[in-house]
Amino acid sequence: ATYKVKLITPEGPVEFNCPDDVYILDSAEENGHDLPYSCRAGACSSCAGKITAGNVDQSDNSFLDDDQVAEGFVLTCVAYPKSNVTIETHKEDDLVG
């Protein structure tokens, strides 16, 4: 399946289609959208975003705790879309506070 991903970035919203077996960060880059990242392995918070609609599979994430996931935080480098999803990007500062 392929889903619509909407990213709310500091420069404004962008939308693209993302297959359910491609990480959102990778798909964003393939569509010409630069997002922050560091490790690309789900082990840091550089790529963190916050889901405002929809849901993802980020079972490869090793950084976020259950409470952060429940609040909607997502590591875009290890997140597969599981529905149409809207994510606010550039949320590392909110996460690490």
From Swiss-Prot:
Textual note on the cofactor: Binds 1 [2Fe-2S] cluster.
Co-factor(s): [2Fe-2S] cluster
Residues that coordinate or bind [2Fe-2S] cluster: 39, 44, 47, 77
Record flagged with keyword Iron: yes
Keyword Ribonucleoprotein annotated: no
Cellular component annotations (GO), alphabetically ordered: chloroplast; chloroplast stroma
GO MF annotations, alphabetized: 2 iron, 2 sulfur cluster binding; electron transfer activity; ferrous iron binding
An example Gene Ontology biological process: electron transport chain
Matching PANTHER family: FERREDOXIN
Summary of the function given for this chain in its UniProt record: Ferredoxins are iron-sulfur proteins that transfer electrons in a wide variety of metabolic reactions.
Protein name: Ferredoxin
Organism: Solanum lyratum (Lyreleaf nightshade)
